[in-house]
Amino acid sequence: MEPSLLMWGFFTFTMIPGCMAGACVQQPPSLRNATFKILGYKVGTTLNCDCQRGFRRDPSSGPYMICRGNSSHSFWENKCQCMPTSSPRIPVKQVTPRPEEQKERKTTETQGQMQPPNQANLPGHCKEPPPWEHESLKRVYHFMEGQTVRYQCLPGFRDGSAQNNSAQSVCKKQEDQEVMRWTQPKLKCKSEKENGSFPEPQMSTAAPPTTKTSLPTRTKGTTDSQNLTEVPATMQPIIFTTQYQLAVAGCVLLLLSILLLSGLTWQRRR
């Protein structure tokens, strides 16, 4: 092994554990149908300088970036750089992510970390570190004690926990333990379609109103040019019953009989 690699391994072995003291090695908890955002990174937070497939970290840069400073001024120390893994003489082909990598990236963007568009200048905190060329699809942080992340439900979901401070997780030392762990957030994102949030339209059971038409009636002493008074009248259909038809037929027969008798009487008188 080359002496430079041995020295670099010794540096990594001696420096990184000191930087990781009092830090949460694991990433914040993942919640279903939710994402988390970070308003600022506490001083001492580190970010691994990971590269995409086909690239590796440039030996001239450090293995990670670290947030340095104090309550009045803070900044990211070191810059991550990636270089091709192949020889510089051979042109490097652009590596197309495999389907599983694209799926992993989509899942990370949906359920992973979401940065607010405008980060506040919190005392003793660094903003989101700048990106570097050919960096890995997923960033790996090592958060310090007291770091807080806040969760929120994805669009189409709402918080059903009904508890205060249920949407945050804090990096803190557990009781009777020396390691740092994240507290479990109690946020429960439920679909907005549950519990009748979107009521279905109900069918009306009321009877339809009676259809009425307004017939104009002319009042006494008015002309055609004057307003007509509208009187509501209910239109009822005319029904010819059997009794009515028999009465009409009887009247017709009686009239014919009278005419016939009158004709006979008139002939006899002649």
Swiss-Prot record:
Residues that carry a glycan: 33, 70, 164, 195, 227
CDD domains (UniProt xref): CCP
Ranges per topology, Extracellular: 22-245
Disulphide bond pairs: 24-67, 49-80, 51-82, 126-171, 153-189
Keywords, alphabetical: Disulfide bond, Glycoprotein, Immunity, Membrane, Receptor, Repeat, Signal, Sushi, Transmembrane, Transmembrane helix
Predominant location: membrane
Entries under InterPro entries matching the protein: IL-2_rcpt_alpha, Sushi/SCR/CCP_sf, Sushi_SCR_CCP_dom
Biased composition, class Polar residues, residue ranges: 112-121, 202-225
Chain positions covered by the region annotation Disordered: 87-124, 190-225
Membrane protein topology class: Single-pass type I membrane protein
Signal sequence interval, chain numbering: 1-21
Recorded GO CC terms: membrane
Localisation per UniProt entry: Membrane
Record GO terms (molecular function): interleukin-2 binding; interleukin-2 receptor activity
Basic and acidic residues bias (residue ranges): 98-108
Record field: transmembrane: 246-264
Regions of this protein lying in the Cytoplasmic compartment: 265-270
A Gene Ontology BP annotation from the UniProt entry: inflammatory response
SUPFAM superfamilies, per the entry: Complement control module/SCR domain
Positions of the Sushi domain: 22-84, 124-191
Role this protein plays: Receptor for interleukin-2. The receptor is involved in the regulation of immune tolerance by controlling regulatory T cells (TREGs) activity. TREGs suppress the activation and expansion of autoreactive T-cells.
Subunit structure: Non-covalent dimer of an alpha and a beta subunit. IL2R exists in 3 different forms: a high affinity dimer, an intermediate affinity monomer (beta subunit), and a low affinity monomer (alpha subunit). The high and intermediate affinity forms also associate with a gamma subunit.
Protein name (Swiss-Prot/TrEMBL): Interleukin-2 receptor subunit alpha
Organism for this UniProt entry: Sus scrofa
Upper lineage: Eukaryota, Metazoa, Chordata, Craniata, Vertebrata
